[in-house]
C-alpha cells in the first residue's frame, strides 16, 4: 500500500492575532509554500494558523475569514489535496472553512477525551463536531490526534485507541511531545495493530527516519523538516517523498 505524504503550510500571524502585520504577505507566503509542497511530490498539504501564538482554544470570525481567503488562493494555485487545522482545537471552524473551499480533510487536536494544554483544558467534542459536519454537509475527512503534542494527557494510548472509532474519526495522528519531536515507534506499532482506520505520524519526520517510521503507519505529516530559512523547500519535500515511496 502506497504511503501518504502531507506537507504543512505554517501560516504567518493572521488578523486578530498579536503579531499580525499584513494579510497579503500571509497569502503570498502560503501560496509559495503550497507550490513547493506540490513541486516536491507530496500528496496533500494542510494549512495551519501556526503564527497565531498564543493560541485560542476557539478562534474568532476574523480567523475563519482569513483562513478561508488563504485556502481559496492556495486551492486556485495547486491541485493536490487540501487540509485545514485551526489551532488550538477549533474543529467547527475548520469544518466551516473546509465546507467553503471544498477541502479534503481537517485535523482536530483533541476530538475526544480531554487534555491540559498551555491554552487551558482542551475538551473533546466529537458529538458536537460530527453533528456540525452533518448539518453543513461537509464531506471533508476528520483526522484526529491521539495524545496530541504540547499537552498533558490523562487517558492512556490504549484508552485513545479503544475509543477512536466511537468518535467517527476517519484517521488518527500520533505525534511526539512537541512540534518537531519524533513520534514513538512503539506507540505507532500499537496504534497500527489495534486500529482499523489509517494511522499517521504527525511530527518529527525527516528524510533519515521516514522509511523507519512508515513501516508502522500509513502516512506522515511533515512541517518542520521541509522548511529552510522559514520557507518550504521543494527539495526537502522530495527527500521525504523518496523515502516514503521509494
Curated annotation (Swiss-Prot):
This protein is called Uncharacterized protein AF_0419
Source organism's superkingdom? Archaea
Extent of the signal sequence:
none
Tell me the InterPro entries matching this sequence.
Aldolase_TIM, BtpA, RibuloseP-bd_barrel
Family, per entry: Belongs to the BtpA family.
Supply the source organism for this entry: Archaeoglobus fulgidus (strain ATCC 49558 / DSM 4304 / JCM 9628 / NBRC 100126 / VC-16)
Amino acid at each position: 500500500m502506497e504511503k501518504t505524504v502531507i506537507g504543512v503550510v505554517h501560516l504567518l500571524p493572521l488578523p486578530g492575532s498579536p503579531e499580525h502585520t499584513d494579510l497579503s504577505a500571509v497569502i503570498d507566503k502560503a501560496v509559495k509554500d503550497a507550490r513547493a509542497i506540490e513541486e516536491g511530490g507530496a500528496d496533500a498539504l494542510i494549512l495551519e494558523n501556526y503564527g497565531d501564538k498564543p493560541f485560542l482554544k476557539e478562534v474568532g470570525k476574523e480567523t475563519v475569514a482569513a483562513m478561508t481567503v488563504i485556502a481559496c488562493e492556495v486551492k486556485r494555485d495547486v491541485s493536490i489535496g487540501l487540509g485545514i487545522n485551526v489551532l488550538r482545537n477549533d474543529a467547527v471552524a475548520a469544518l466551516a472553512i473546509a465546507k467553503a473551499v471544498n477541502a479534503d480533510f481537517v485535523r482536530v487536536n483533541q476530538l475526544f477525551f480531554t487534555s491540559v494544554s498551555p491554552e487551558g483544558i482542551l475538551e473533546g467534542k466529537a458529538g458536537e463536531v460530527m453533528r456540525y459536519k452533518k448539518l453543513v454537509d461537509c464531506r471533508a475527512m476528520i483526522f484526529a490526534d491521539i495524545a496530541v503534542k504540547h499537552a498533558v494527557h490523562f487517558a492512556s494510548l490504549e484508552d485513545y485507541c479503544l475509543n477512536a472509532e466511537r468518535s467517527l474519526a476517519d484517521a488518527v495522528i500520533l505525534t511526539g511531545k512537541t512540534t518537531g519531536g519524533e513520534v514513538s515507534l512503539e506507540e505507532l506499532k500499537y496504534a497500527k495493530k489495534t486500529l482499523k482506520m489509517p494511522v499517521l505520524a504527525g511530527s518529527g519526520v525527516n528524510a533519515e527516519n521516514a522509511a523507519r517510521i512508515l513501516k508502522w503507519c500509513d502516512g506522515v505529516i511533515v512541517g518542520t523538516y521541509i522548511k529552510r530559512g522559514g520557507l518550504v523547500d521543494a527539495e526537502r519535500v522530495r527527500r521525504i517523498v523518496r523515502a516514503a515511496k521509494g
